[in-house]
């Protein structure tokens, strides 16, 4: 008789909690937020645009509805980031007898002027024809030295992309990487002068806090990025706006809804941090900046949410976790979902290196169990980075179930009962 009473009581508690979460996290609310963020009015939410500012204001207004607190010392929900754009106004020089100009030079720099008068001024790196361009070049940006990078003309197409990449705004830096497209990989001399026009540009993350109770100094982060690709050339249907409904208005929608849910539950012993990152699409600058301002050692977990608008390869009621094997984060989440129909799986696309391709990467590199939750079929995502990534292609009911499952699965982490094992730091 007592056992029957306990079972009935437990079922009643589960039912009451289910009703509570359904009132806050449901398909109608998902659609309201998603529809706003991915609307044409947001102009594709490109960095440094009126559209992304409008999106940021909307996210901040939603955080205000949930009565989230500001970051310590902040006067609003915006975490402002100063970037520097260097536009070359004059490039002159020679590599041996070969003229150097805007056609064969790309400089990743925030210096007003660059002068290279010999091959000993900068450390020389050679990218040969047979080298993998990405694997050879991108690690160079982490080296705190001035580099002169000679790129074989076999990589001419990738070099053009590098010119576009280096022209973007970036964090101010004391070192520069200068790329030269040339067939002369063993030069005897160089003379190069680059004169730049520098312009400051502002970005902003949107950040709100739900202070904890007994473990207030420990942080759990819920994040997604709210930027996308903006406006481009019209497609065959005449659509020029990259709405980014799935990438990543979907993740940002989840962050807003989780903030609202937890603010109503008031059951977090740890402090919860809700972040909508900027500039993920253009280099992850928002999450990089955030990781420098938060104490990684006190950050016990990060739920980064990216592209959850479509069904996963396993169908509805499922999602995958990147870097599943790097901590016991995923196992904890699945344990908290016992008795439900939802299941988390390890990332099925290891060749895509997704763990280090989203906003979780910078905190993960510092040892935080920071993982991305997604449903995107990355080996066959036809609408990825296209104008067709519209709200009509998303499943609101499934999104709602995913967001509920993130809320439920995080319970023992936000309560302080469980602490995921740390990720190995990148050296």
Where are these regions (language model features)?
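His/Asp/Glu-rich mid-to-C-terminal helical/loop segments that flank catalytic regions of hydrolases
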Residues: 380-427
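Soluble metallo-hydrolase cores and metallopeptidase-like ectodomains found primarily
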Residues: 161-244, 257-260, 264, 269
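Metal-dependent peptidase/peptidase-like ectodomains
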Residues: 215, 267, 277-381, 418-421
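Bacterial Sec-dependent N-terminal signal peptides
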Residues: 1-25
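Noncatalytic luminal/extracellular "stalk/propeptide" segments of secretory-pathway proteins
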Residues: 43-146
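Second-shell loop/turn segments in exported
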Residues: 20-24, 40-50, 77-80, 122-129, ...
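N-terminal hydrophobic or amphipathic helices/low-complexity stretches enriched
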Residues: 16-55, 59-70, 210-212, 217-219, ...
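Active-site metal-coordination/substrate-binding segment of hydrolases
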Residues: 102-146, 217, 223-263
């Amino acid at each position: 008789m007592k056992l029957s009473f306990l079972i009935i009581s437990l079922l009643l508690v589960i039912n009451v909690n289910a009703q509570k979460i359904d009132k806050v996290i449901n398909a109608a609310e998902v659609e309201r937020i998603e529809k706003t963020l991915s609307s044409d009015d947001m102009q594709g939410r490109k960095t440094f645009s009126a559209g992304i500012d409008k999106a940021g204001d909307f996210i901040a207004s939603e955080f205000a509805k949930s009565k989230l607190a500001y970051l310590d010392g902040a006067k609003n929900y915006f975490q402002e980031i100063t970037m520097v754009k260097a536009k070359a106004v004059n490039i002159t020089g020679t590599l041996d007898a070969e003229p150097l100009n805007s056609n064969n030079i790309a400089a990743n720099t925030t210096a007003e002027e660059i002068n290279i008068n010999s091959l000993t001024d900068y450390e020389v790196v050679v990218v040969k024809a047979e080298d993998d361009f990405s694997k050879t070049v991108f690690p160079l940006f982490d080296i705190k030295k001035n580099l002169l990078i000679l790129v074989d003309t076999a990589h001419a197409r990738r070099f053009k992309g590098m010119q576009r990449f280096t022209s973007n705004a970036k964090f101010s830096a004391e070192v520069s990487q200068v790329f030269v497209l040339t067939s002369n990989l063993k030069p005897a001399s160089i003379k190069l002068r680059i004169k730049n026009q520098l312009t400051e540009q502002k970005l902003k993350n949107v950040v709100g806090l739900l202070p904890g109770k007994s473990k207030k100094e420990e942080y759990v982060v819920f994040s997604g990025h709210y930027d996308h690709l903006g406006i481009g050339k019209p497609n065959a249907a005449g659509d020029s706006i990259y709405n980014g409904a799935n990438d990543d208005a979907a993740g940002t929608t989840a962050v807003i809804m989780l903030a609202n849910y937890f603010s109503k539950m008031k059951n977090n012993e740890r402090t919860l941090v809700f972040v909508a990152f900027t500039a993920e699409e253009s280099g992850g600058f928002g999450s990089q900046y955030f990781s420098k301002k938060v104490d990684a050692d006190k950050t016990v977990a990060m739920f980064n949410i990216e592209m959850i608008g479509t069904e996963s390869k396993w169908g509805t009621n499922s999602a995958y976790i990147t870097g599943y094997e790097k901590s016991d984060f995923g196992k904890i989440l699945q344990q908290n979902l016992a008795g439900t129909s939802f299941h988390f799986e390890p990332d099925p696309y290891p060749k895509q290196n997704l763990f280090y391709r989203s906003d979780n990467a910078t905190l993960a590199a510092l040892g935080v169990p920071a993982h991305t939750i997604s449903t995107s079929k990355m080996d066959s995502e036809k609408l990825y980075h296209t104008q067709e990534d519209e709200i009509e292609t998303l499943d609101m009911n499934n999104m709602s179930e995913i967001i509920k499952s993130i809320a439920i699965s995080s319970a023992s982490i936000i309560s302080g009962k469980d602490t995921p094992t740390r990720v190995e730091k990148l050296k």
